[in-house]
UniProtKB/Swiss-Prot annotation:
<feature type="binding site">
    <location>
        <position position="307"/>
    </location>
    <ligand>
        <name>Zn(2+)</name>
    </ligand>
</feature>
<dbReference type="GO" id="GO:0042292">
    <property type="term" value="F:URM1 activating enzyme activity"/>
</dbReference>
<keyword id="KW-0963">Cytoplasm</keyword>
<dbReference type="InterPro" id="IPR036873">
    <property type="entry name" value="Rhodanese-like_dom_sf"/>
</dbReference>
<dbReference type="InterPro" id="IPR000594">
    <property type="entry name" value="ThiF_NAD_FAD-bd"/>
</dbReference>
<protein>
    <recommendedName>
        <fullName>Adenylyltransferase and sulfurtransferase MOCS3</fullName>
        <ecNumber>2.7.7.80</ecNumber>
        <ecNumber>2.8.1.11</ecNumber>
    </recommendedName>
</protein>
<feature type="binding site">
    <location>
        <begin position="127"/>
        <end position="131"/>
    </location>
    <ligand>
        <name>ATP</name>
    </ligand>
</feature>
<feature type="binding site">
    <location>
        <position position="99"/>
    </location>
    <ligand>
        <name>ATP</name>
    </ligand>
</feature>
<keyword id="KW-0808">Transferase</keyword>
<comment type="pathway">
    <text>tRNA modification; 5-methoxycarbonylmethyl-2-thiouridine-tRNA biosynthesis.</text>
</comment>
<dbReference type="InterPro" id="IPR045886">
    <property type="entry name" value="ThiF/MoeB/HesA"/>
</dbReference>
<comment type="pathway">
    <text>Cofactor biosynthesis; molybdopterin biosynthesis.</text>
</comment>
<feature type="binding site">
    <location>
        <position position="304"/>
    </location>
    <ligand>
        <name>Zn(2+)</name>
    </ligand>
</feature>
<dbReference type="GO" id="GO:0061605">
    <property type="term" value="F:molybdopterin-synthase adenylyltransferase activity"/>
</dbReference>
<dbReference type="Pfam" id="PF00899">
    <property type="entry name" value="ThiF"/>
</dbReference>
<feature type="binding site">
    <location>
        <position position="229"/>
    </location>
    <ligand>
        <name>Zn(2+)</name>
    </ligand>
</feature>
<dbReference type="GO" id="GO:0032447">
    <property type="term" value="P:protein urmylation"/>
</dbReference>
Length: 451
């Protein structure tokens, strides 16, 4: 008789052992990458790359395999053999192997782009999988660039893939970008957008820029023909508190897939000379209604600091300093309050939580539904700022001795809320929790969900 319980236990054991082996392999591979980076830095090489497999050869004809593989686009009248050869001899740099970069790279590799450069300093984690479609659970913890390379070579082994596993910055950007024909901005932060724009203007490289947030996406091509650059449209960066990335605002995976695929399309059009490139225009996608709009954007700014006839910026600058933001999409803590106006999460647990107080969670209702602290009441930040919460807590707010604690996901929105509430109730003790719910998980309760 089959012992089903024993078989199930054996299966569970094997799955656990396989997961442990994969994790060990990922750690070893990361150690190797770190060692190669150290060697690269010691020898003055700014790249983490794989050897050039085509030796810089200019292909003048297609192989039988090329013809069979790419036949459906070869028969397009405006594409043909010459279009495929241009793709085969082209190189595209994709900055960010996330929700935009993954589908863009997938379609470029599938279309027969000769060389792809993949830039990403980050590692694969579980929160990536719903939109970053080249990565897999088996490669959790692996460099995103390396993970994408594995998937792309399974799709098309003839595509040369170069991995740059370090953070793009002012010191290495020019060296890396100059070896590619087209650049795709698939990043999720303002500092990198300015860095890429300035480098592409200086090196005269077309820049295909995409973005996606919630159910919306945008796409345009900068530094192409007589079209404007990013600085022409945004000469001054926005304040840090006005910037929302997908880690804070959320995004539907299919929206990033839509924009990423269209970034690949624009890159192909630039390389092949196909159709009307999206320069001087902005494509806006509303995923909630599936509507596309195509609008004209301003022309080149005559006094642009980078792309004008007499530019003020002729070399790359410190973009994190210029933007007041980190060049990553990781937690970027704001510093809007003095230290005495803030509360450490452990101090809250040990002292304040045991006493009467009003704990206001300023996240959106959808986020509050995911997880919340005991006794927290949900008042979204927008309601705090427009004072619509006042009637709800009129009795509590009459007691000036009752501490008011503001809480959010990471400790950023709560600072904005504190500033506003303090102006309305200057006699109250009003503070926020440093690091928000992320800090609660990391320092107090590891079982508390993190997202």
């Amino acid at each position: 008789m089959i012992d089903s319980e024993a078989l199930e236990n054996e299966r569970t054991k094997l799955k656990r052992e396989i997961a442990e082996l994969r994790a060990a392999l990922n750690r070893k591979e990361q150690c190797l990458r770190d060692l190669e980076t150290t060697i690269s830095e010691a020898t003055g090489d700014e790249d983490d790359v794989h050897p050039d497999t085509n030796g810089g050869v200019c292909h003048t004809q297609l192989s039988n395999d090329d013809i069979a593989r790419y036949s459906r686009q070869l028969i397009l009248p405006d594409f043909g053999v010459q279009g495929q050869l241009r793709l085969k001899n082209s190189s595209v740099l994709i900055v960010g192997m996330g929700g935009l970069g993954c589908p863009a790279a997938q379609y470029l590799a599938a279309a027969g782009c000769g060389k792809l450069g993949l830039i990403d300093y980050d590692e694969v984690e579980r929160s990536n999988f719903h939109r970053q479609i080249l990565h897999s659970e088996a490669r959790c913890g692996m460099s995103k660039a390396e993970s994408a390379r594995i998937a792309l070579l399974e799709l098309n082994q003839h595509c040369e893939i170069r991995c740059h596993t370090r953070l793009l910055n002012s010191r290495n950007a020019m060296h890396i970008i100059r070896t590619y024909d087209v650049v795709l901005d698939c990043s999720d932060n303002v500092a990198t957008r300015y860095l890429l724009n300035d480098a592409c203007v200086m090196l005269r490289k077309p820049l295909v820029s995409g973005s996606a947030l919630k159910t919306d996406g945008q796409l345009t091509v900068y530094c192409y023909g007589n079209g404007p650059c990013y600085r022409c449209i945004y000469p001054v960066p926005p304040p840090p508190e006005a910037v929302t990335n997908c880690g804070d605002g959320g995004v539907l995976g299919a929206v990033t897939g839509t924009i990423g695929a269209m970034q690949a399309l624009e890159a192909i059009k630039v390389i092949v000379g196909l159709g009307d490139v999206l320069a001087g225009r902005l494509l806006i996608f509303d995923g909630s209604s599936c509507l596309f709009r195509n609008i004209r954007i301003r022309s080149k700014r005559p006094n642009c600091h980078v792309c004008s006839a007499q530019p003020l910026i002729t070399e790359l600058i410190d973009y994190e300093l210029f933007c007041g933001m980190h060049a990553t999409d990781k937690d970027n803590p704001l510093q809007l309050l003095a230290s005495e106006e803030r509360l450490d999460v452990e101090e809250y647990r040990n002292k304040v939580q045991q006493q009467p107080h009003l704990l206001i969670d300023v996240r959106q209702p959808a986020e509050f539904e995911i997880c919340q602290l005991p006794d927290a009441v949900n008042v979204p930040l927008a309601e705090v700022l427009d004072d619509s919460y006042l009637k709800r807590f009129s009795k509590q707010l009459e007691d000036t001795q009752l501490p008011i604690i503001l809480l959010c996901r990471r400790g950023n929105d709560s600072q904005i809320a504190v500033q506003h509430v303090r102006n309305r109730f200057p006699k109250h003790s009003i503070r926020d929790i440093i690091g928000g719910l992320h800090a609660w998980t990391h320092k107090v309760d590891p079982s508390f969900p993190i997202y």
